[in-house]
Each structure stands twice: as C-alpha cells, then as structure tokens.
Amino acid sequence: MRQLSRRAALAVGAGAVTLSVVGWSQGAHAAAKEAADEVAKFTGGKAATQGKITIELPEIAENGNTVPLTVSVDAPMTAENYVSDVLVVSEGNPNPGVVTFHFTPLSGKAEAQTRIRLAATQNIVVVAKTSKGEFYTALKQVKVTIGGCGG
C-alpha cells in the first residue's frame, strides 16, 4: 500500500474542502433563487419598493428551532387603502415560504408576531401587498448557530 506524502495529503484535503464549499454555495444560490421565485409569484412579477416594513429578529439566533419574528408595516389601514397580505420568505431554508399574514382594515395595524424555524444563517425577506396593488419589501440577515430545519 502506497503512503501519501504530506504535500499530497494536504492537496487532497484542500480539494475536499473546496468541493464541499462549492456544493454548499450552489445549494445556497438555489435556495435564494427559490425564495426569489416565491416573492415573484406573490407580487405577480411587479417591483417592490424598499421601506415601510420593520422586521424584528435577533441578530444572532442561538437555536434555529424557534426564532422570534415581529413584522410591522407603516401604512394606512383604511377601507380604501390597507395592507392586505404580508409574505415572509427565508433564503436558506429547504422550503422558502415561511408564513403569509392576511389583514383587513379592521385589523387596525399591519403587525404580526410568530416564531420561525431557520436552517442556517440567512436573509429573511418580507414583502407587503396593499389593497391598491402596491408592494413594499425589506430584508434582514439572521446568524443561526444551531440550525432548526435539519441543519
């Protein structure tokens, strides 16, 4: 049996690390594309304007199994103009659609709280739709130390 030299062993190890990083990177890009597709389906391909949305998430989530999330939209809630739906999408989970909240003018305020599961460090994208067909968006990154979706 032939032994590997130290140089050859290091080269093989570096190659394995490179392949695993490339594989992870391709998976991350695929998840981000799926998230973008989910947003495009929600908006019907219309552009969303930055602003009006506040996302409250911890900067670092020690456990991805239960991450507190509060979403609020600074918009009128009148019969003529109100936030009707808010979509929350994760760019790093196996299934990007996290939750969709539905509101009416009787809601009084477009705000919701929940707990979400996150597989790894990732961006959370929130898109709000108004009754007039306008869309607003915001993004926030969360660092996850222990994944909650099998990660």
Descriptions of predicted regions:
Residues M1-S20:
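N-terminal secretory signal peptides and thylakoid transit peptides that target proteins
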Residues G23-T54:
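C-terminal segment of N-terminal export signals and the immediately downstream linker at the start
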Residues P68-P76:
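Short edge beta-strand/loop segments characteristic of extracellular beta-sandwich folds
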Residues D85-V89:
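Beta-strand signatures of extracellular beta-sandwich domains
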Residues P94-R117:
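An anionic, turn-rich surface loop/hairpin at beta-sheet edges
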Residues A119-N123:
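Extracellular Ig-like/FN3 beta-sandwich strand-entry sites
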Residues S131-T137:
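Short acidic/polar inter-strand loop motif in beta-rich domains
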